[in-house]
Design a protein with these regions (language model features):
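ABC ATPase nucleotide-binding domains
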Residues: 38, 77-233
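ABC ATPase nucleotide-binding domain helices that frame the ATP-binding cleft
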Residues: 50-53, 149
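Helix-to-loop junction immediately C-terminal to a conserved catalytic motif
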Residues: 57
Length: 347
């Protein structure tokens, strides 16, 4: 999705900083999130992504910098007066209330007319695929259903921005994958800007329009998922987002994804490929694929994956210790600059 700025961004952070004593949790970041984006803050634990989300929500006060929501500076504005809602991993539902009362709670506090509350409650439950659940209690629902109730409660009062703090972290893998698809679909339908925090790279790549990669309180890169994965700016991004190979050739550090590397038949030349010889030092069967680790004759080690296909193959599956020829297209090798922005700042 391409965004053309015709109005102020829904979120603008300028020099945003957060200190806890001498610890720098967020180190002067700049960031803009456009209306209607599904924007993800991705990073390891302690990288500053959740602290940034909490400052946007108003739960934490910045140590420096500014936060704008839809063009208005909101420093000092309490959370309940900001045009944002937050969905947490623990759902934060009222167990004694019905699903319908949970969803409509914010509307009741805002003194919305009873008939309008009921209409918007039912509309929100329909959006999250839970029609007919209004009279149930949260304790009668599965984890995925409770998460959808929390989402319905967050969108029912039509916030400008929805903040989601690792909302799928407590779900099992299959349900989490299902909810990723549903969340993206719901976001597209309601048109609300989503800012999503996660440490899960697959989750970020699956759902996001753009991703900001956090590390040590700084932003390493902001890109669309494909650009982030295929053209990482530095070694940290290459290593954190998926699996990557890093080798040095002709004075450059190159990153190559395992799925871009091919096992070649030495007797059959392939035009347009850069090829190198090496030896298989590890073989790991992983169901649909087999993972190989190859020590290259010219230095460096590569990981590559090969689908476990039935039937004849141009190249026999190599055993550990085998001498092999591997190759990749030059455009699939991306040059990276340095290890991280933190290293650049320190130097």
């Amino acid at each position: 999705m391409t965004y053309v700025a015709t109005s102020p961004p829904d979120i603008r952070l300028v020099g945003l900083t957060k200190h806890y004593g001498e610890v720098v949790a967020v180190a002067g970041i700049d960031l803009e999130v456009e209306p209607g984006e599904f924007f993800t803050l991705l990073g390891p634990s302690g990288s500053g992504k959740t602290t940034t989300l909490r400052m946007i929500a108003g739960f934490e006060d910045p140590s420096g910098g500014t936060i704008e929501l839809a063009g208005e500076e909101v420093s000092g504005v309490p959370p309940y007066d900001r045009a944002v809602n937050t969905v947490f991993q623990d759902y934060a539902l009222f167990p004694h209330m019905t699903v319908g009362d949970n969803v409509a709670y914010g509307l009741r506090v805002a003194k919305v007319d009873k008939s309008e509350r009921a209409r918007r409650r039912d509309e929100a439950l329909e959006m999250v695929r839970l029609p007919g659940y209004a009279e149930r209690k949260p304790g009668e629902l599965s984890g995925g259903q409770r998460q959808r109730v929390a989402l319905a409660r967050a969108i029912v009062n039509r916030p400008k921005v929805l903040l989601l703090d690792e909302p799928l972290g407590a779900l099992d893998l299959k349900l989490r994958e299902q909810m990723q698809v549903e969340l993206k679909t719901i976001q597209s339908e309601v048109g609300i800007t989503f800012v999503y925090v996660t440490h899960d790279q697959d989750e970020a790549l699956t759902m996001s329009d753009r991703i900001a990669v956090f590390n040590d309180g700084r932003i390493e890169q902001v890109s669309a998922p494909r650009q982030l994965y295929e053209r990482p700016d530095n070694e940290f991004v290459a290593g954190f987002v998926g699996v990557s190979n890093l080798i040095e050739r002709d004075g450059e550090r190159l990153t190559i994804r395992p799925e871009k590397i091919q096992l070649l038949d030495p007797a059959v030349p392939v035009d347009g490929l850069h090829s190198e010889r090496g030896r298989v030092v590890e073989v790991a069967y992983a169901g649909m694929v087999t993972r190989y680790t190859v020590a290259l004759d010219h230095g460096g080690t590569l990981q590559l994956v090969r689908q476990n296909l039935e039937g004849p193959s141009a190249v026999a599956a190599p055993a550990q210790g085998s001498e092999v020829l591997v190759g990749w297209r030059p455009e699939h090798a991306a040059a990276v600059r340095g290890k991280s922005t933190t290293e650049e700042v320190a130097s």
